[in-house]
UniProtKB/Swiss-Prot annotation:
It comes from Alkalilimnicola ehrlichii (strain ATCC BAA-1101 / DSM 17681 / MLHE-1). This is Small ribosomal subunit protein uS9. GO terms for biological process: translation. Disulfide bonds: none annotated. One of its GO terms (cellular component) is cytosolic small ribosomal subunit.
Length: 130
């Protein structure tokens, strides 16, 4: 267990991901399953790979992820955030290009709460003039 590993916690909406980067061949495992098996949509898989592709590290690391909460979109965003933080821990020089791409910043957008007297967060009952 002497091999080097880098850790990053990522969050998005209600999802949180714990990401471990270890030197390897580019294998990505999410909750014990392969990336293609875990995410059905290609866009979610693409989001997860973005930070590694940006710094040309797709074949350098094996990625081990534990993700919980939220849906596929939030989980993919959380994993991306975690991978980014782990890459910054690996090499501080990568922070500048990753930050420029907008991967370092935690996406603070959350679901707006439902208000009393409305159907949804903003949807009101239809207005009748007469």
């Amino acid at each position: 267990m002497a091999e080097q590993q880098y850790y990053g916690t990522g969050r998005r909406k209600t999802s949180s991901a714990r990401v471990f980067l270890r030197p390897g061949s580019g294998d990505i495992k999410v909750n014990g399953r392969s990336l293609d098996e875990y995410f059905g949509r290609e866009t979610a898989r693409m989001i997860v790979r973005q930070p590694l592709e940006l710094v040309d590290a797709t074949e350098q690391f094996d990625v081990q992820v534990t993700v919980a909460g939220g849906g596929p979109s939030g989980q993919a965003g959380a994993i991306r955030h975690g991978i980014t933080r782990a890459l910054v821990q690996y090499d501080e020089a990568l922070k500048q290009p990753l930050s420029k791409a907008g991967y370092v910043t935690r996406d603070a957008r959350m679901v707006e709460r439902k208000k009393i007297g409305l159907h949804k967060a903003r949807r009101a009952t239809q207005f009748s003039k007469r």
